[in-house]
From Swiss-Prot:
One of its GO terms (biological process) is maturation of SSU-rRNA. GO terms for cellular component: cytoplasm. Disulfide bonds: none annotated. Gene3D superfamilies: 3.30.300.20. This is Ribosome-binding factor A.
Amino acid sequence: MNAHKERLESNLLELLQEALAGLNDGELNSLSVTKVECSKGKHHALVFVLSSDHKILSKLKKAEGLIRQFVLQASGWFKCPKLSFVLDNSLEKQLRLDAIFNEIAKGKDND
């Protein structure tokens, strides 16, 4: 991955956190953005948020215009990527893997 893309994704992640924190919706302003993946040319960004509620995605879709407007004003960029929000389930996967490894470790201790 090139340095420019990494820097862009990092900046966008910070700006999105600030944008969400500034919204008047209690559910949205407490969300955590865990990861941002930008396409080439900064036309599209996949935004991973930490939540177990699928209803959050529709709220984020409705607030996308406000979020993009904040990003443009705060960054000074000429354009803001189209944002697609996705629930981040990597924490759940990690917890399941940890549980599996703990079971394996217990099995070895019993041998």
